[in-house]
Regions:
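Conserved catalytic core of the tyrosine transesterase superfamily
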Residues: 1-296
Length: 296
């Protein structure tokens, strides 16, 4: 039953492996809860009070309401699938209301912080391969705004040196082409020279020193480690670099629709999240420049 749902997400919905794995973990977690608390294995006979008790149990683990809502959303999608395939008559989660969550304010890195990290690589006591690879990862995140999952799945063939672009496979396997800066291409050329000594013929662009495909946890550690040296911000992750990319473009007057395409968003509403920081900049300039801004 769960397997059929996961296949549906992969084949019909075109969800990424990362997303499908998250769904699988959530569903197995709920199934295990049913077995332990109710000695019940049949997911077709679930009622809302049982689901509610699972939510209460999750709340007691002190994980965030946002994470709980995501887990419940996975379960709701699963039961929608069962309803669609006529395995159940109604969705036991149809009237469920999400837990209240605080609005998250993503604080982007400043351009000075990003430049400090990029310039810091030459001073690192690492092998040249690791240093250049890590520098390329930072430059690529900031200059293209790609997601972490997109970065680790880039193949060498996705890079076009003649067009100065890189092909990115986004959510639901949607392709987009993102331009590359000359400085990034320079770093990329050097990285490919060094990579050849570690993994000849491996199609993945980013690899470990052992010649294996790079993985998400390592990418996170790279970003967190370098930015911890230059930034006091609470959150230092690949997503904050993506957020910085969008915010800085908008601050410099980039068109919202263009930023939407670069980020690979399916709707403009997703991109508008990044306009708040740009609005803050506009307000600051307005208050500093308007002749009557200091009058009471």
């Amino acid at each position: 039953m769960i397997t059929a749902f996961l296949e549906y997400l992969s084949l019909e919905k075109k969800y990424s492996v990362h997303t499908i794995t998250a769904y699988k973990k959530d569903l197995i977690s709920f199934r295990d809860f049913l077995v332990i608390e109710y000695a019940q294995e049949n997911l077709l006979e679930v009622n809302y009070p049982q689901i509610r008790s699972w939510v209460v149990a999750l709340v007691e683990t002190k994980i965030s309401n946002r994470t709980i809502n995501r887990k419940v959303s996975s379960l709701k999608s699963f039961y929608k699938f069962l309803q669609k395939t006529k395995q159940i008559d109604g969705n036991p989660l149809s009237k469920h209301k999400a837990l209240k969550t605080e609005k998250r304010v993503q604080v982007p890195f400043t351009s000075n912080e990003i430049n400090a990290v990029i310039n810091h690589f030459e001073k690192e006591g690492q092998s040249e391969f690791v240093s250049v690879r890590n520098k390329l990862i930072v430059e690529l995140f900031y200059s293209t705004g790609i997601r972490r999952a997109e970065l680790i799945n880039i193949k060498e063939r996705d890079v076009s040196f003649s067009d100065k672009t890189i092909k990115v496979l986004g959510k639901r396997n949607k392709e987009r082409f993102v331009p590359l800066l000359s400085s990034v291409i320079q770093t990329l050329n050097r990285y490919l020279e060094l990579k050849a000594a570690f993994a000849i013929g491996l199609e993945e662009l980013f690899i470990t020193e052992k010649g294996n495909k790079i993985y998400e946890t390592l990418v996170y550690r790279i970003i967190n480690s370098y930015f911890s040296k230059v930034s006091s911000k609470q959150k230092k992750s690949p997503h904050i670099l993506r957020h910085s990319f969008a915010t800085h473009l908008l601050n410099e007057g980039a068109d919202l629709n263009s930023v939407k395409e670069l980020l690979g968003h399916s709707s403009l509403a997703s991109t508008q999240v990044y306009t708040q920081n740009s609005l803050d900049v506009i307000k600051k300039v307005y208050n500093q420049a308007h002749p009557r801004s200091h009058k009471k």
